[in-house]
Structures are given as structure tokens and as C-alpha cells.
């Protein structure tokens, strides 16, 4: 985020999770209305369907933790989300809803709101996408796999073996692909595994994925947002398998980190996080 940009702090009342789900439901409503107008292209339609599936899954999970009186359907959350957008876009207190009011400072001189002066605050301290450290956050006993002079099949098998030893909880996985002393792929993955009673393991959340090109330059950084959170077990395996398969395609040329980054990004509709030059690599 540029230094001269500002953000408006928002108080979300009953909890950030509820506010986020409701807001994304409002976004879904906008997507659907655009689709009804036949103004949504094919990638947009894919994003609409993906967002709807993720929201339905997340709402189902979230409602289980809420008292029955507070559980809401997707349609109810859509209505609240649209109202939230009015607050955010127009900063209009009359559009506000209970538990969600824009942050303001008391100032009776403002004509739009007798008691408030709408103010933009400098960004809060913390890391934005472009400022994230290259190494994932600290994790106990991180796993590092160095693949030297291995063919693709052996490399894939070694990664699988290492991943299968992960215990429940957060993990960090560093993959270094080294063929004839040429670093052709380096991927850092940070996520959370779940271990099930039957011994089955699943990747519940992908917190971060960094991909580097052959020169060691960072090609792509993924951080945890809702659409980068794996909502079901099979998605977790699909994401990791997409990485493994990069080692097993049998290409004569070294596998590039950019290829892996594009492959993973595309699963989330996040290709725009790569520059055109990186996307062409």
C-alpha cells in the first residue's frame, strides 16, 4: 500500500467474522445482479460460483458456533452486506445497521452528521501484501526439503513423504529444487494441517505461499484471505497435489517457480497478483 493512501477504520460491532461474511454476501449479491444483466464474462461467472460455494460452506460452519437465534441464511446476510456497502461507499450514517457504524470523531460542525466528522486515518501498523516478509511466520520445527539432482518422480515422492509426517497444527514447508547446482524452483508454504480420528490428514488453511524464480527473485506472494482459505478437506489435498504434480510433468527444462505460482493462483482466481511479465514466464 502506498504511503500516501489512507484507510477508514470501521467498527464492526458483533465481530469481524460476521461482518466479513455479511460483506462478502453483499459482494455476491452484486455479482448476481451483474450476471442477471448479462454483463458478467466467463471468468467473472466462475468467480461468482466459487464465491457462492465458499460462502455457503463458511456460513454453514459459522452458524454451528452461533446461538440459534443469531443464525442467518445467505439471503439474510446479502441484505446486510448491501447495507454495509452503502456505509462504506457513501459514509452515510443513515444507511448504517446495528453493530456496524463507520468510525468517526465527534465534531458538531459537520453538516452531514451533527455528531460526527468523517475522517480518513493513516493505515494502521502492520504488513500489507507488498510488505510481507519473504520467509513465512515462525513455526515450530519447520520442514525443509532440498531436492538435489533428483528426477521429477523421486522429488515428488520425497515431498509427499515429508508432508505426510506433518503433525496437526501449523506447519512450514520449504521446497528447494536444485538440478546440477541450478536452483530452478523454490516454494515456501505455510499452512495448518488437521488430523482426523481415522488417521486422515487434511490441509485446512493455506496461510501463505511464496514462489521464487530461477534467479531467486520473489515471483508471487499469497497471504491468507477468505478466498485463500480452504473450506473443505479435499481442497487442501488438491492444492498440495497441484504443487507435487509440477515435479512430475516430465519437462526437459527445469520447472520454473512462475509456473507453479500461476498454477496455484489460478485455483483461487488470483492471477492478477502476478505482473504480466511474471505471468508469461
From Swiss-Prot:
Q: Which UniProt keywords apply?
A: Host cytoplasm, Host nucleus, Host-virus interaction, Inhibition of host innate immune response by virus, Inhibition of host interferon signaling pathway by virus, Inhibition of host ISG15 by virus, Inhibition of host PKR by virus, Interferon antiviral system evasion, RNA-binding, Viral immunoevasion
- Show the segment(s) annotated as G1P2-binding: 1-103
Q: Does the keyword Oxidoreductase apply?
A: no
Q: Which Pfam families match?
A: Flu_B_NS1
Report residue spans for region: RNA-binding and homodimerization.
1-93
Cellular compartments per GO CC: host cell cytoplasm; host cell nucleus
Molecular-function GO term, any one? RNA binding
Membrane-spanning regions, if any?
A: none
* Compartments reported by the entry: Host cytoplasm; Host nucleus
InterPro entries (alphabetical) = NS1 (IPR004208), uS15_NS1_RNA-bd_sf (IPR009068)
- Chain positions of motif Nuclear localization signal: 50-55
A Gene Ontology biological process noted in the UniProt record is:
symbiont-mediated suppression of host type I interferon-mediated signaling pathway
SUPFAM superfamilies (alphabetical): S15/NS1 RNA-binding domain (SSF47060)
Q: Which family does it belong to?
A: Belongs to the influenza B viruses NS1 family.
> What does the subunit section of this Swiss-Prot or TrEMBL entry state?
Homodimer. Interacts with and inhibits human G1P2 conjugation by UBE1L.
The UniProt function text for this chain reads:
Binds and inhibits the conjugation of the ubiquitin-like G1P2/ISG15 protein to its target proteins. Since G1P2/ISG15 is an early antiviral protein, NS1 may inhibit the host antiviral response. Prevents EIF2AK2/PKR activation, either by binding double strand RNA or by interacting directly with EIF2AK2/PKR. Also binds poly(A) and U6 snRNA.
Domain remarks in the Swiss-Prot or TrEMBL record: Both N-terminus and C-terminus can inhibit IFN-beta promoter activation and IRF-3 nuclear translocation.
**Protein name as annotated:** Non-structural protein 1
The source organism is: Influenza B virus (strain B/Yamagata/1/1973)
Amino acid at each position: 500500500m502506498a504511503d500516501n493512501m489512507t484507510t477508514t477504520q470501521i467498527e464492526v460491532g458483533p465481530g469481524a467474522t460476521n461482518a466479513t461474511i455479511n460483506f462478502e454476501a453483499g459482494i455476491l449479491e452484486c455479482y448476481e445482479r451483474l450476471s442477471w444483466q448479462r454483463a458478467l464474462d466467463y471468468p467473472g461467472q466462475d468467480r461468482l460460483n466459487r464465491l457462492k460455494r465458499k460462502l455457503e460452506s463458511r456460513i454453514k460452519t459459522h452458524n454451528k458456533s452461533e446461538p440459534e437465534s443469531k443464525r442467518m441464511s445467505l439471503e439474510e446476510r446479502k441484505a446486510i452486506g448491501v447495507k454495509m456497502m452503502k456505509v462504506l461507499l457513501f459514509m452515510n450514517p443513515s444507511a448504517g445497521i446495528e453493530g456496524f457504524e463507520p468510525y468517526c470523531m465527534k465534531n458538531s460542525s459537520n453538516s452531514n452528521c451533527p455528531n460526527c466528522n468523517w475522517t480518513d486515518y493513516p493505515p494502521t501498523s502492520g504488513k500489507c501484501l507488498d510488505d510481507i516478509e519473504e520467509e513465512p511466520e515462525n513455526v515450530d520445527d519447520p520442514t525443509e526439503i532440498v531436492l538435489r539432482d533428483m528426477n521429477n518422480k523421486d522429488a515428488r515422492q520425497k515431498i509427499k513423504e515429508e508432508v505426510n509426517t506433518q503433525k496437526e497444527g501449523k506447519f512450514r514447508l520449504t521446497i528447494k529444487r536444485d538440478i546440477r547446482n541450478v536452483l530452478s524452483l523454490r516454494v515456501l508454504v505455510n499452512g495448518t494441517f488437521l488430523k482426523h480420528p481415522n488417521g486422515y490428514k487434511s490441509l485446512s488453511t493455506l496461510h501463505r505461499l511464496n514462489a521464487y524464480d530461477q534467479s531467486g527473485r520473489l515471483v508471487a506472494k499469497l497471504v491468507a484471505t477468505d478466498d485463500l482459505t480452504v473450506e473443505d478437506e479435499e481442497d487442501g489435498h488438491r492444492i498440495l497435489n497441484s504443487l507435487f504434480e509440477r515435479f512430475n510433468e516430465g519437462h526437459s527444462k527445469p520447472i520454473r517457480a512462475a509456473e507453479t505460482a500461476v498454477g496455484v493462483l489460478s485455483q483461487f482466481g488470483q492471477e492478477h497478483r502476478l505482473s504480466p511479465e511474471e505471468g508469461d514466464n
